Regions:
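Membrane-interface segments at loop-to-transmembrane junctions
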Residues: 284-294, 325-329, 360-368, 693-705, ...
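Cytosolic catalytic regions of ATP/NTP-dependent phosphoryl-transfer enzymes
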Residues: 64, 243-251, 367-541, 547, ...
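Alpha-helical transmembrane segments of multi-pass membrane proteins
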Residues: 99-118, 132, 136, 158-159, ...
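Basic, amphipathic juxtamembrane/active-site segments
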Residues: 210, 227-231, 384-405, 585-589, ...
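Hydrophobic alpha-helical transmembrane segments
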Residues: 119, 127-158, 165, 281-376, ...
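Non-lumenal N-terminal regulatory segments of integral membrane proteins
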Residues: 1-184, 189-197, 202-210, 214-282, ...
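Helix-interface capping motifs at the ends of transmembrane segments in multi-pass membrane proteins
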Residues: 107-127, 170, 295-333, 346, ...
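Membrane-embedded transport module
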Residues: 303, 307, 338, 345-347, ...
Length: 902
């Protein structure tokens, strides 16, 4: 029967421990969407759309070049709905309040409170109601504030789109600005630099269009999009050059495109649906505190019936025995645990908020401290998500100012839209050099970029009788129109030997994760008229410019600090292995053997788990790869954090014990995260880890103190009940003692923590807690029994007529020893000398001890059935407490050496 009750309680724990602060919007096929990767049907549909020509796309989606009219829009919207992404829906406040209340201890305390009320023990019922109420409200208020702050961050990059629509009955059309939720499949939209892609699109016209897809793919550099595919056999929709996906951003250029999918039917929508519908399993904090809770509840369920049976059998008054057993049950239940946990977490959240960190879920604070593996995306998380000019070299790989200045003139004088590479080149030259170059060279003409040539040229003149054509573009395209190279200052033919040297240098740059662009030139006699493509011939290859998305300045020190704190960092990125390895090298992370997404497709969970343990860098991963790796690392017993900012990171953010999103993250990433960093500095990660460990240490102090003290008290009660002709303490005394002790614990969230307790990840360990109870609980029982002997033999309180004196004597010893244990157990060091508690805790425990001594002498003594103690009692009290502290310190030293100290 006991096992059945235990199983039921365990089930209750798993269901009711702190839950996320949201409820899910139901979607069609939600279970299949949440449980699988992007459906094959969606991939097939995207590939089919990519393969269509413009007329086929118009027919397939019911649109036409002049735009849809109002009737057509409503008809299509009736089928596909608004262009809105399925999202998590905030709970009503009353549901949130219920979720904050329904943890096992609150439910258990409520039952005990109702029993106390039914037996007219209003004092106990009131105390219990107060504890439950404070805990619930603290949790409710703090999480509501955090959620409100997180909601305030949700702002789309652009909430309108430029759409061609029929505007009157005459069939006239115009470009109009509409909220993106009003788009429907078949709409014709116009794109320009800076626009967010408002839906899934098929490009039908494009000019110099580059789109940043890092939020979906992890690819740090923008990709080109065109109207006619250059790779019709492409089987990955995200790499199709005629498709654009919702949530990505136009970096440069212009385009017109047809809407092919909206809302939940988009690629973004499918990922969002997966995240919204996936019911997250309990995280490490919830599981850990659940196991500890079960240990304490089991202990209470075993000891309370024993106390009832012994007292009922020896005293003969079963009703009195039942009331006493109920008081013992209340005393054994750590009713302050929910409040201590919540207030400690809330204090951690407040401290982190001063570091501009939003903590959406309070239990994420402790998970921060328990985290032993941090998986992180690369682009925009570790890196700046900004392209910079890294190298400018001649063909031998030596730094060349000539190449830099030629590239600058090309980027400066071109009149087309300047892409990110042009911006990086322009920023790579200081202002003085830029003024000198622009003053020295005048523009003559240009040959614009196009996708067939994949290069662009400008013609400049320093002297009136000579023009210089400067061309930059993709390496192979420049080689195709070059016949010579500048080598060690000389012009030499581009032969096979030189070509091998060029390949060797550029391959080395590529292996460093750099994107290489070639620069070439030639001198021409001055002439009138325009320059044409045919003039891009017989060029001299000057060298290369190479680009990189560099790490944030704080990345390397942050990762170093995390490593020093015992946290293993793993990179999970959708970018190429070469680029990712370069970033790892830049931030001081040993990448080792790189694993790419295609390598893990056919691995079993056990094989991948083994691989994940020893691998630092994973590249070319899909969102589902990231989620799977995080889940398997958790299965191996690790507490896993994931840090990311893109759409492709959302499933992994949800799967992790602690999801961390960074500044500038997309909405879906913020929504899936537990913690949001508002500062670009990643050093706040280390602050969060330390705060999490400090929070855990303070929570564990309360649990250890309460568990060991309660174990000792119950053991003492059992001994006294077996041999005394009266109750060793009245139920009222137990409740008052428990209340006063609990009051002294209110300051624990403000306590100091020893340095050694925050040097490595901390985890819940019920076995260690049980062992701790067995070691330290009986110490208090030894001195309780000495107190029994003192009161019985020295003060002759050994008859029912003198039981009040006996109970008063034990009440004071029990309260003071219980309160002193706070200072003994809060540190492995010598208390008050090597480690001192924070002043709020010293003040609170001092006040409670003073009140405990004064209570038997106060006017309330008669009401509380206590009596004044003789002065001769107090030297004995000092001796008992001193002995208790000395023995506890000795046992603590042995325990710490043998088992360690959390």
């Amino acid at each position: 029967m006991f096992k059945n009750i235990t199983r039921q309680l365990q089930a209750l724990l798993s269901r009711h421990l702190p839950h996320r602060l949201v409820q899910r919007d139901p979607l069609p096929n939600a279970k299949s969407m949440a449980g699988a990767a992007i459906p094959a049907s969606l991939t097939e549909r995207c590939l089919n759309v990519a393969a269509m020509d413009e007329n086929e796309v118009w027919r397939a989606f019911g649109g036409h070049p002049e735009g849809l009219n109002a009737a057509e829009v409503e008809k299509i919207r009736a089928v596909h709905g608004d262009n809105q992404i399925p999202a998590q829906k905030p709970s009503p406040w009353w549901v949130h309040l219920w979720l904050c209340y329904r943890n096992p201890f609150n439910l258990l305390l409520t039952v005990l409170g109702l029993i106390s009320y039914a037996t007219e023990d209003l004092f106990a019922a009131g105390v219990i109601a107060l504890m439950v109420g404070i805990s619930t409200l603290l949790n409710f208020i703090q999480e509501a504030r955090s959620t409100k702050a997180a909601d305030a961050l949700k702002a789309m990059v652009s909430n309108t789109a430029t759409v061609s629509r029929v505007i009157n009955d005459l069939g006239e059309n115009a470009w109009v600005e509409l909220p993106i939720d009003q788009l429907v499949p078949g709409d014709l939209v116009k794109l320009a630099a800076g626009d967010m892609i408002p839906a899934d699109l098929r490009i039908i016209q494009a000019r110099d269009l580059f789109v940043a897809q890092a939020s979906l793919t992890g690819e740090s550099l923008p990709v080109e999009k065109v109207a006619r595919s250059r790779d019709p056999q492409q089987m990955n929709p995200l790499e199709c050059d005629t498709l654009c996906f919702m949530g990505t951003t136009v970096v440069s250029g212009t385009a017109q495109a047809i809407v092919t999918a909206t809302g939940g039917d988009t690629w973004f929508g499918q990922l969002a649906g997966r995240v919204s519908e996936q019911e997250s399993e309990p995280n490490a904090f919830q599981k850990g505190i659940g196991r500890v809770s079960m240990l304490l509840i089991r202990f209470m369920m075993v000891m309370t019936p024993i106390v009832l049976l012994i007292n009922g059998y020896t005293k003969g008054d079963w009703w009195e025995a039942a009331l006493f057993a109920l008081s013992v049950a209340v005393g054994l239940t750590p009713e302050m645990l929910p409040m201590i946990v919540t207030s400690t977490l809330a204090r951690g959240a407040v401290k982190l908020s001063k570091q501009k960190v939003i903590v959406k879920h309070l239990d994420a604070i402790q998970n921060f401290g328990a985290m032993d593996i941090l998986c992180t995306d690369k682009t925009g998380t570790l890196t700046q998500d900004k392209i910079v000019l890294e190298n400018h070299t001649d063909i031998s790989g030596k730094t060349s100012e000539r190449v830099l200045h030629s590239a600058w003139l090309n980027s400066h004088y071109q009149t087309g839209l300047k892409n990110l590479l042009d911006v990086a080149v322009l920023e790579g030259v200081d202002e003085e050099s830029a003024r000198t170059l622009s003053g020295r060279w005048q523009k003559v003409d240009e040959i614009p970029f196009d996708f067939e040539r994949r290069r662009m040229s400008v013609v400049v003149s320093e002297q009136t009788d000579v023009h210089q054509l400067i061309c930059k573009g993709a390496l192979q395209e420049i080689l195709n129109v070059s016949t010579q190279v500048r080598y060690n200052g000389d012009i030499v033919p581009l032969d096979d030997t030189m070509l091998r040297r060029i390949r060797r240098v550029t391959d080395n740059l590529n292996r460093q994760g750099l994107r290489v662009v070639a620069v070439a030139s030639k001198f021409l006699p001055a002439r009138e008229g325009d320059y044409q493509r045919i003039d891009e011939s017989d060029l001299i290859l000057e060298g290369y410019i190479a680009f990189l998305d560099p790490p944030k300045e704080t990345t390397a020190p942050a990762l170093k600090a995390l490593k020093a704190s015992g946290i293993t960092v793993k990179i999970l990125t959708g970018d190429s292995e070469l680029v990712a390895a370069k970033v790892c090298h830049e931030v001081g992370l040993d990448a080792g053997d790189v694993v790419v997404g295609s390598d893990i497709e056919h691995l079993s969970d056990d094989e991948l788990a083994k691989l994940a343990r020893r691998t630092t860098l994973f590249a070319r991963l899909t969102p589902m790869h990231k989620e799977r790796i995080v889940t398997l690392l958790k299965r191996e017993g690790h507490v896993v954090g994931f840090m990311g900012d893109g759409i492709n990171d959302a499933p992994a953010l949800r799967a992790a014990d602690i999801g961390i999103s960074v500044d500038g993250a997309v909405d879906i990433a913020r929504e899936a995260a537990d913690i949001i960093l508002l500062e670009k500095s990643l050093m706040v990660l280390e602050e969060g880890v330390i705060e999490g460990r400090r929070t855990f240490a303070n929570m564990l102090k309360y649990i250890k103190m309460t568990a060991s003290s309660n174990f000792g008290n119950v053991f003492s009660v059992l001994v006294a009940s077996a041999f005394l002709p009266f109750l060793p303490m009245l139920p009222l005394h137990l409740l008052i003692q428990n209340l006063m002790y609990d009051v002294s614990q209110v300051a624990i969230p403000f306590d100091n923590v020893d340095d050694e307790q925050i040097q490595k990840p901390q985890h819940w360990n019920p076995a260690d807690l049980g062992r701790f109870m067995l070691f330290f609980g009986p110490i208090s029982s030894i001195f309780d029994i000495l107190t029994f002997c003192l009161m019985w033999f020295v003060f002759h309180a050994n008859t029912p007529e003198h039981q009040t004196l006996f109970q008063s004597g034990w009440f004071v010893v029990g309260l003071l020893s219980q309160t002193l244990i706070v200072h003994m157990i809060r540190t492995r060091r010598i208390p008050f000398i090597q480690s001192r508690a924070a002043w709020p805790l010293i003040v609170m425990t001092g006040i409670v001890m003073a009140l405990g001594i004064a209570l038997p002498f106060s006017p309330l003594a008669g009401y509380l059935q206590l009596q004044a103690l003789p002065l001769s009692y107090f030297p004995w009290l000092v001796a008992i407490l001193a002995g208790y502290m000395v023995l506890t310190q000795m046992v603590k030293g042995f325990y710490a050496r043998r088992y360690g100290w959390q």
